């Protein structure tokens, strides 16, 4: 655990991966369309093309209009360079969600949100960009707030030419901080140390299992990604087990991300991880049930987001077992919860 933050730039990612065709793609009632609006704004239009009302999780997803989470992915240089994301990635406590954490869409209904991409991405150099939205959106049945599954979504490719000077004038969703002292003291410090120790143990065990191909098809859809899965998990184990880590750990809320049901969040551009109050009050040190949430796998989840640990950092393509296992192989390989769920499964022999 490190006291001063380290700034890092998100590493290159493949445009081909973002735009690849998923041969296992499932039918979905969701239609997502992106359209340019002004210099750097993107209008996102979500339509329910199904025959029944949908109760979709908005908290922490691309539908979230409060938290500065990644709503679209942007690529430059003809699609070869992923644009650095400057917001936060969160892990939610998936039990005890509230009705206002969801968006209800009747059959045929449309919801529109506007995303100011310059507030969340590094666009000051300007140029040509390709924009996507793709993942699995968790839902609850009827008026329930208990997650029941996930629905795939994939937008069109939106090509934009952005004026860098104009984009640079847009206020950032998160203000940069040069140094933030750790507030993990007393019992919180003890809890975080235990979580990181367990994180290192679980990540090491999961890395060994991945090398052997154990359970990979369930959580990552293929065994061909074994070396990448294992390498990321080994990097996480190293960081969780180090006293001179590549991430900064904090127990207060300097970026105001600890809203209801947020267990922890990471600011990837700073390799900065914050553990929220419910991380300490609502989670066990280690889960005793398959796919259960705990402090160890929450730490592991957040560590995978940090590009300073393993580059590029992961996305939040799908929360929870249902959403994570609905992802394509490429999406799962870059999904934080897939690693957390996999580590849990190896630990408990699920």
From Swiss-Prot:
Q: What is its EC number?
A: 3.4.24.39
Cofactor(s) this protein requires:
Zn(2+)
The biological processes this protein is annotated with in GO are: proteolysis
> Does the keyword Transport feature in the UniProt annotation?
no
Looking at the record's lineage, which domain of life comes first?
A: Eukaryota
Binding note for cofactor: Binds 1 zinc ion per subunit.
> Sorted alphabetically, which InterPro entries does this protein's record hold?
Fungal_M35_metalloproteases, MetalloPept_cat_dom_sf, Peptidase_M35
Q: Which cysteines are joined by disulfide bonds?
A: 184-251, 258-276
* Pfam families listed in its UniProt record: Peptidase_M35
UniProt xrefs under SUPFAM superfamilies:
Metalloproteases ('zincins'), catalytic domain (SSF55486)
Protein name per the record? Neutral protease 2 homolog SNOG_10522
Annotated organism of origin: Phaeosphaeria nodorum (strain SN15 / ATCC MYA-4574 / FGSC 10173) (Glume blotch fungus)
């Amino acid at each position: 655990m490190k006291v001063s933050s380290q700034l890092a730039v998100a590493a290159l990612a493949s445009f081909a991966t973002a735009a690849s065709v998923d041969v296992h793609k499932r039918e979905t009632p969701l239609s997502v369309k992106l359209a340019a609006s002004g210099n750097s704004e993107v209008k996102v239009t979500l339509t329910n093309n199904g025959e029944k009302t949908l109760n979709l999780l908005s908290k922490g997803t691309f539908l979230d209009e409060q938290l500065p989470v990644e709503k679209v992915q942007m690529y430059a240089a003809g699609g070869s360079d992923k644009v650095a994301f400057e917001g936060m990635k969160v892990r939610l406590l998936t039990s005890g969600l509230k009705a206002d954490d969801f968006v209800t869409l009747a059959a045929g209904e449309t919801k529109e949100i506007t995303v100011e991409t310059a507030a969340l991405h590094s666009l000051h150099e300007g140029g040509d960009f390709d924009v996507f939205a793709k993942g699995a959106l968790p839902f609850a049945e009827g008026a329930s707030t208990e997650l029941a599954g996930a629905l795939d979504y994939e937008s069109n490719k939106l090509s934009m030419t952005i004026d860098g000077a104009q984009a640079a004038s847009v206020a950032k969703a998160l203000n940069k901080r040069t140094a933030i002292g750790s507030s993990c003291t007393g019992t919180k410090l003890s809890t975080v140390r235990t979580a990181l120790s367990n994180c290192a143990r679980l990540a090491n065990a999961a890395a060994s299992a991945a090398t052997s191909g154990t359970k990979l098809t369930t959580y990552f859809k293929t065994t061909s990604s074994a070396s990448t899965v294992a390498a990321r998990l080994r990097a996480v184990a190293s960081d969780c087990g180090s006293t001179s880590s590549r991430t900064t750990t904090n127990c207060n809320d300097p970026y105001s991300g600890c809203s209801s049901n947020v267990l922890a969040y990471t600011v990837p551009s700073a390799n900065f991880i914050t553990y929220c109050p419910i991380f300490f009050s609502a989670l066990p040190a280690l889960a005793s049930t398959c796919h259960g949430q705990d402090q160890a796998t929450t730490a592991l989840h957040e560590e995978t987001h940090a590009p300073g640990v393993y580059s590029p950092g992961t996305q939040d393509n799908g929360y929870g077992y249902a959403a994570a296992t609905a992802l394509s192989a490429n999406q799962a390989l870059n999904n934080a919860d897939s690693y957390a769920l996999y580590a849990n499964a190896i630990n408990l022999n699920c």
